[in-house]
Regions:
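Structural register within alpha-helical repeat arrays
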Residues: 124, 158, 195, 230, ...
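Alpha-helical linker/edge segments of TPR/alpha-solenoid repeat scaffolds
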Residues: 166-173, 189, 194-211, 268-315, ...
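TPR alpha-solenoid repeat register
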Residues: 154, 171, 188-191, 226, ...
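Thioredoxin-like thiol-disulfide oxidoreductase module
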Residues: 6-14, 42-111
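A short beta-strand-turn-helix
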Residues: 3-22, 218
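Short coil turns that delineate tetratricopeptide repeat
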Residues: 149, 182-186, 220-222, 238, ...
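Conserved redox-active cysteine motifs that mediate thiol-disulfide chemistry
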Residues: 26-40
């Protein structure tokens, strides 16, 4: 448990909540319900074993913070609890609620034990894959998905490894549970991208040989079907830049060809290549806090993922071709 003041608001609360959800208990010494709620929250912090952290803020001593949070949520009484996730206040409740109701509240925002283990296994698998220990990485990713089927990044990493091993059937099976999220008005770009990746791998064996496609393109640079098929073959085996080079040739000559299929596939490849933004660390916010003493920002600062020069280069190429 930590006590929050204006001095450590950014470093301990905002930056800290980027690592683990933090439940802020706004209380006062004269408040009877606050005294009843406090021990319940402390017990829950112990029961949840690190899945969230409890912080306390004395409303009498820290009126600026308490006032801004109360205004933000339209609350005028205490005890008032606000949960911070990823540097942001996302939800809250008022009053000394029963333990069961507080658990329901926490479970909406706090990762399950399985989700935490799944995330750790995903990170370990990424390192194993980078070290060439593919079999061990596959085992860990399969276990990570079993623990938390909602761990999309574990699913994507598993799809990548399976396709790299030339196993599109298994990759398609891993993709199937999220396939519905790749279509319709609310289609998710990252899910759609991996759907195109799997489809490319499934269709590649039925396409004409690369040597034949290359000859057709040499004879007719506007043979977009041959060029797209060649791009699909490159995409299927992870030759991403080669695939985008072929797609770019189509886009530069006919942006609208086949309902913008070349552009859509190009964007999908960029998405597959892009790593998810890592969790923000506390260091930038801590450094910023030293320069911002006395200034209260309810929303936290976040890191921007370091740029991949290859991805940046191909984004620029696409932009130039389109505009």
């Amino acid at each position: 448990m930590i006590d929050i003041t204006l001095e450590n608001f950014e470093t301990d609360l905002l930056a800290g909540s980027a690592q683990v959800p933090i439940l802020l208990d706004i209380w006062a010494p004269w408040c009877g319900p606050c005294k009843a709620l406090g021990p319940v929250l402390e017990k829950l912090e112990t029961d949840y074993a690190g899945r969230f952290q409890l912080a306390k803020l004395n409303a009498d001593e820290q009126q600026e913070i308490a006032g801004q949070l109360s205004q933000m949520f339209g609350v005028r009484s205490i005890p008032f609890c606000v949960i911070f996730v990823g540097g942001q206040p996302v939800d809250g409740f008022v009053g000394a609620l029963p333990e069961a109701q507080i658990r329901e509240f926490l479970d909406k925002h706090v990762p399950s034990e399985g989700a935490i283990e799944s995330e750790l296994e995903t990170a370990q698998a990424e390192q194993l894959a980078a070290d060439g220990q593919t079999a061990s990485a596959l085992d860990l990713l399969e276990d990570a998905l079993a623990r938390d089927p909602g761990n999309d990044e574990a699913r994507y990493d598993l799809i990548k490894l399976l396709l790299a091993q030339g196993n599109p059937v298994a990759a398609a099976s891993v993709f199937e549970p999220i396939a519905s999220r790749a279509t319709g008005l609310l289609a998710e770009p990252r899910v759609t991208a991996f759907g195109r990746y799997v489809n490319a791998a499934q269709s590649a064996p039925d396409l004409r040989p690369a040597t034949v496609l290359t000859e057709l393109i040499a004879a007719n640079k506007r043979d977009f079907t041959a060029r797209f098929d060649l791009a699909q073959q490159h995409f299927a085996v992870g030759l991403f830049t080669q695939a985008m080079d072929e797609l770019l040739e189509i886009i530069m000559r006919d942006k609208a060809w086949s309902d913008e299929l070349a552009r859509k596939t190009y964007v999908a490849i960029l998405e597959v290549m892009t790593k998810p933004i890592p969790k923000p660390s506390a260091k930038p916010a801590a450094a910023a806090a030293a320069d911002q003493k006395g200034k209260l920002e309810i929303a936290g600062k976040h890191e921007v993922a370091s740029a991949d020069p290859v991805i940046d280069q191909y984004r620029r190429k696409l932009s130039m071709a389109l505009f």
